[in-house]
Design a protein with these regions (language model features):
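Acidic, serine/threonine-rich low-complexity disordered tracts
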Residues: 20-80, 129-212
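Positively charged n-region of N-terminal signal peptides that target proteins for export
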Residues: 1-4
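Short, linear, compositionally biased motifs with a strong N-terminal bias
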Residues: 10-11
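Solvent-exposed helix/loop surface patches that form functional interfaces
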Residues: 25-27, 85-156
């Protein structure tokens, strides 16, 4: 169960400047580091997102991201690879075709033109990570706020996106919600995860951005 929850957190990361740039990092060789804490603020794991390849053609970018999860400094899973396509500033993340991951269902979309009140796509996705299938049904997906957020990596202007979901992992059904703060040129700056009662269960915070 713990592994499945960490995998979901890693997928959230893979969903990541210019004033009107996309809500993801487009610099090849960049590395984003995150820390995950429990509800009391105690560190439980860390993770990295490496931008390993960026291919551009006109206004279209294909960005390969590799996510690695760590517990006590030791890799917890094999790397998770995703490919994000940026077209006209909109970010579409395809969870299929990765090093340790395959998926069925709709991709994840972050539009260039964010606005409070904007409703984002919902739907179902089934992810197979190293033989472990995680089925997630997103039932609510909306931009709920815009605010400046300070994290260890810096201060960012962010849009806050709330997502409510029902997930099935290892035969166990989990209902919950997430709030993610997205910044242009970075992607996810912070993600708070809540249980079905709305109680905070974990936070994932950007601690460092390394640009080559």
């Amino acid at each position: 169960m713990k592994k499945a929850i960490l995998v979901l957190a890693g997928l959230g990361l893979a969903l990541t400047a210019l004033a009107q740039g996309p809500f993801t990092c487009t610099t090849e060789g960049a590395k984003l580091r995150y820390m995950t804490t429990d509800a009391k603020g105690n560190e439980t794991s860390t993770s990295t997102v490496d931008i390993t390849k960026v291919i551009s053609s006109g206004d279209i970018f294909k960005i390969t991201q590799v996510v690695q999860l760590y517990i006590n400094g030791t890799a917890f899973t094999k790397p998770i690879e995703t490919v994000a396509t940026v077209k006209d500033g909109d970010v579409v993340v395809d969870f299929g075709g990765g090093l340790a991951l395959a998926a069925e269902g709709a991709g994840f979309i972050l539009p260039k033109r964010m606005a409070v009140g904007l409703e984002l796509p919902t739907g179902e996705v089934t992810v197979d990570v190293q033989g472990m299938k995680v089925k997630q049904d997103i039932t609510f997906h909306k931009v709920v706020d815009k605010e400046e957020l300070t994290v260890p990596a810096g201060t960012y202007e962010c849009y806050v996106v709330e997502r409510q979901y029902s997930a099935k992992m290892l035969g166990i059904k989990v209902n919950g919600s997430m709030k993610t703060w997205y910044a242009r040129g970075i992607g996810a700056v912070r993600t708070d995860t809540y249980d079905k009662k709305g109680k905070l269960s974990s936070s994932q915070i950007l601690t460092e951005v390394v640009i080559p």
